[in-house]
From Swiss-Prot:
Family: Belongs to the casein kinase 2 subunit beta family.
Pfam families xref list: CK_II_beta (PF01214)
Protein name listed in UniProt: Casein kinase II subunit beta
Free-text function comment from the UniProt entry: Participates in Wnt signaling. Plays a complex role in regulating the basal catalytic activity of the alpha subunit.
Gene name per UniProt: CkIIbeta
Sites bearing Phosphoserine, chain numbering: S2
Length: 235
């Protein structure tokens, strides 16, 4: 393969099955040390991982040590994910994610009344390893587990807790209107009042069966009295 046909690490990573939620971070952004402030304290093998992301030649000892190479690969994936979480809060990053949002790359809301509203990736924590990525519906304002299992192992910290909200703050024109229809439970054609379940639960909580009755024993005050006349006498 010629050098002109070689694929960059970033393009390769984003093209992996299960990484469809990621966009390609601009190389200029990665090379700016200001954008990486503090990440060296979070990512092991930081220097080697950054070199791998930027397609710089690895050290000879890394090439000769498969175990070390695997560790650097894992560190590079983590580092790229954390860089990605910062990048998609920038104007350029938001623009790239909007393109994916409009084509439905992040899936569609499973709620019937949201009418297949496109969703956005969201993290429930900004700390790596705490929660996997979820999908956020801006129409019903709720969070769902991604439909495809291949996205169930993507760390939510690589998208952050604030990305969808930043996108709609910068581009309010993309925020959909809230759904006008709301599901109403019915029984025999009649609407079930919202208090019906609450009253039912309250009634169940107030009903307490006597303990002895639960065990199939008569209540204490109903126990037969000991009658001396009925007890057989020993001869």
């Amino acid at each position: 393969m010629s050098s002109s046909e070689e694929v960059s690490w970033v393009t390769w990573f984003c093209g992996l099955r299960g990484n469809e939620f990621f966009c390609e971070v601009d190389e200029d952004y990665i090379q700016d040390k200001f954008n990486l402030t503090g990440l060296n304290e979070q990512v092991p093998n930081y220097r080697q991982a950054l070199d791998m992301i930027l397609d710089l030649e690895p050290e000879d000892e890394l090439e000769d040590n498969p175990l070390q190479s695997d560790m650097t690969e894992q560190a590079a994936e983590m580092l790229y994910g954390l860089i990605h979480a910062r990048y998609i809060l920038t104007n350029r990053g938001i623009a790239q994610m909007i393109e994916k949002y409009q084509t439905g790359d992040f899936g569609h809301c499973p709620r019937v009344y949201c009418e297949s509203q496109p969703m956005l990736p969201l993290g429930l924590s900004d700390i790596p390893g705490e929660a996997m990525v979820k999908t956020y519906c801006p129409k019903c304002i709720d969070v769902y587990t991604p439909k495809s299992s291949r996205h169930h192992h993507t760390d939510g910290a690589y998208f952050g807790t604030g990305f969808p909200h930043m996108l709609f703050m910068v581009h309010p024109e993309y925020r959909p209107k809230r759904p006008t229809n709301q599901f109403v439970p019915r029984l025999y054609g009649f609407k079930i009042h919202s208090l019906a379940y609450q009253i039912q639960l309250q009634a169940a909580a107030n009903f307490k069966m006597p303990l002895r009755a639960q065990r199939g024993q008569p209540p204490k005050d109903e126990e037969p009295e000991n009658n001396a006349d009925t007890v057989p006498k020993r001869l």
